[in-house]
């Protein structure tokens, strides 16, 4: 898979990132390099490899699983410009 200039402009528009026309070829090269690396990762044989959380074996510390409301919902949204029922209200960014 490769990315063309039209796709670069579309991704930039969706991400709300300004990309100058002069920078489009550079961004296109970078995105294609990233996709090539991901394709390399897809070709790695991981059959029989156990899932891991870290490269170094470390014991996972556990805490007691207690459900709480946290008691700080008001403090969390106190500085937000817009909230509704303890939720942040944000503008729509995906069309």
From Swiss-Prot:
Top enzyme class: ligase
Statement: the UniProt record of this protein carries the keyword Ligase: yes
Catalytic activity field: L-glutamyl-tRNA(Gln) + L-glutamine + ATP + H2O = L-glutaminyl-tRNA(Gln) + L-glutamate + ADP + phosphate + H(+); L-aspartyl-tRNA(Asn) + L-glutamine + ATP + H2O = L-asparaginyl-tRNA(Asn) + L-glutamate + ADP + phosphate + 2 H(+)
GO MF annotation: an example: glutaminyl-tRNA synthase (glutamine-hydrolyzing) activity
Keyword ATP-binding appears in the UniProt entry: yes
Record keywords, A-Z: ATP-binding, Ligase, Nucleotide-binding, Protein biosynthesis
InterPro entries: Asp/Glu-ADT_sf_sub_c, GatC
Function, as annotated: Allows the formation of correctly charged Asn-tRNA(Asn) or Gln-tRNA(Gln) through the transamidation of misacylated Asp-tRNA(Asn) or Glu-tRNA(Gln) in organisms which lack either or both of asparaginyl-tRNA or glutaminyl-tRNA synthetases. The reaction takes place in the presence of glutamine and ATP through an activated phospho-Asp-tRNA(Asn) or phospho-Glu-tRNA(Gln).
Protein family (similarity comment): Belongs to the GatC family.
Oligomer and partners: Heterotrimer of A, B and C subunits.
UniProt-listed NCBIfam families: gatC (TIGR00135)
The protein's name in its UniProt record: Aspartyl/glutamyl-tRNA(Asn/Gln) amidotransferase subunit C
Phylogenetic classification of the source organism: Bacteria, Pseudomonadati, Pseudomonadota, Alphaproteobacteria, Hyphomicrobiales
């Amino acid at each position: 898979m490769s990315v063309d200039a039209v796709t670069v402009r579309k991704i930039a528009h969706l991400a709300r990132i300004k990309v100058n026309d002069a920078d489009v070829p550079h961004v296109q090269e970078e995105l294609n390099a990233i996709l090539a690396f991901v394709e390399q990762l897809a070709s790695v044989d991981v059959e029989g490899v156990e899932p891991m959380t870290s490269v170094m074996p470390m014991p996972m510390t556990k805490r007691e699983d207690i459900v709480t409301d946290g008691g700080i919902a008001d403090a969390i949204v106190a500085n937000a410009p817009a909230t509704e029922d303890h939720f942040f209200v944000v503008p729509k960014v995906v069309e």
